[in-house]
């Protein structure tokens, strides 16, 4: 194989992730790579919440078109931004080792969520984060916050918010870990499906490339991500509903924790299940939660 072209978004975090994959391909597979950057609709439309403009697929469409048009061979994404159902002909070819999956509380004035005064303004556009925050602290005011990591931090620093919630993984990768005031316990805020995992997307028809990329695959990330995504798929969850799922692997046993909540955080359902088949485990836990009224909670 002469060279692999990797499609990437333009943000610093996206390029960190893409360069991480590029370096692994070059060093471990001995295949030269180039990066092709592009803006996606999700990067351009910043004045509306994602759930109002088409969801997470808006961060991927342009990259997928580049692959279909032979302008790129693979694309690199944050798995939490990848919908549970990919367009026909695409697949997830390789999962990278997981970074810290927890949400991060970032504030210049307060040390933790518990320290926030009544009525404090917290920035996040994630319905999952909003619902869990309001469930824990219903006296907070949650305001939308879009943009890349640097944009969000500058809005906090300008005094627009008392605190903001980001993914710990992104801050760690950008060497901004000192900005994290509190790693939010999963008991308070269960992470998004796939949070902390970088994934490689490829075309199903490209068997030779898939075989090579598979050599980079992290088995643990692949298994926990499969369980989380199977849960999400069974519930048909996107960014328009408050769903969280987080799996841990111990030997061959997977512990899957999941949460669904109403958007105001007043109703919340949490369950966990243990199993060794990730797809089956995700589906079974979703079915159990559906039987317990998950859909009614998500619709309220």
From Swiss-Prot:
Protein keywords: Porphyrin biosynthesis, Transferase
Annotated cofactor note: Binds 1 dipyrromethane group covalently.
UniProt keyword Transferase present: yes
Superkingdom: Bacteria
PTM annotation (S-(dipyrrolylmethanemethyl)cysteine): residues: 239
Biological processes, Gene Ontology terms: protoporphyrinogen IX biosynthetic process
Pathway named in the protein's UniProt entry: Porphyrin-containing compound metabolism; protoporphyrin-IX biosynthesis; coproporphyrinogen-III from 5-aminolevulinate: step 2/4
Enzyme class: transferase
GO molecular function: hydroxymethylbilane synthase activity
Gene Ontology CC terms, in alphabetical order: cytoplasm
EC identifiers of the protein: 2.5.1.61
Catalytic activity of the protein: 4 porphobilinogen + H2O = hydroxymethylbilane + 4 NH4(+)
PROSITE patterns named among the record's database cross-references: PORPHOBILINOGEN_DEAM
Cofactor(s) listed: dipyrromethane
Cited InterPro entries: HemC, Porphobilin_deaminase_cofac_BS, Porphobilin_deaminase_N, Porphobilinogen_deaminase_C, Porphobilinogen_deaminase_C_sf
Record-linked CDD domains: PBP2_EcHMBS_like
Subunit field text: Monomer.
HAMAP family: Porphobil_deam
Further information: The porphobilinogen subunits are added to the dipyrromethane group.
Protein task: Tetrapolymerization of the monopyrrole PBG into the hydroxymethylbilane pre-uroporphyrinogen in several discrete steps.
Family designation: Belongs to the HMBS family.
Protein name according to UniProt: Porphobilinogen deaminase
Organism listed in the record: Francisella tularensis subsp. novicida (strain U112)
Gene: hemC
């Amino acid at each position: 194989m002469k060279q692999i072209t990797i499609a990437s978004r333009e943000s610093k975090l996206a390029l960190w992730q893409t360069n991480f994959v590029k370096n692994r391909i070059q060093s471990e597979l001995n295949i030269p790579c180039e990066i092709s950057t592009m803006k996606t609709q999700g990067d351009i439309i910043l004045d509306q919440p994602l759930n109002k403009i088409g969801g997470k697929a808006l961060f991927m469409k342009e990259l997928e078109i580049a692959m279909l048009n032979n302008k790129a061979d693979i694309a690199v994404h944050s798995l939490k931004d990848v919908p549970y159902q990919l367009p026909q002909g695409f697949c997830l070819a390789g999962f990278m080792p997981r970074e810290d999956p927890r949400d991060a509380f970032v504030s210049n004035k307060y040390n933790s969520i518990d320290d926030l005064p009544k009525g404090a303004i917290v920035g996040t556009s994630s319905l999952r984060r909003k619902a869990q925050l309001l469930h824990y602290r219903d006296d907070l005011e949650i305001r939308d916050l879009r943009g890349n990591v640097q944009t969000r931090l500058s809005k906090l620093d300008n005094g627009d918010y008392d605190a903001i919630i980001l993914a710990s993984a992104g801050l760690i990768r950008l060497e901004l870990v000192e900005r994290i005031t509190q790693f939010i316990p999963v008991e308070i805020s269960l992470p998004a499906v796939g949070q902390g995992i970088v994934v490689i997307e490829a075309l199903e028809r490209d068997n030779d490339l898939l075989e090579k990329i598979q050599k980079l695959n992290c088995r643990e990330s692949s298994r926990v991500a499969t369980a989380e995504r199977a849960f999400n798929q069974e519930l048909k969850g996107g960014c328009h509903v408050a769903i969280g799922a987080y799996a841990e692997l111990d030997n061959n046993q997977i512990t899957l924790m999941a949460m669904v909540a109403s958007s105001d955080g007043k109703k919340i359902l949490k369950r966990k299940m243990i199993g060794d088949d990730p797809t089956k485990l995700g589906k079974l836990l979703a079915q159990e939660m559906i039987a317990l009224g998950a859909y009614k909670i998500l619709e309220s």
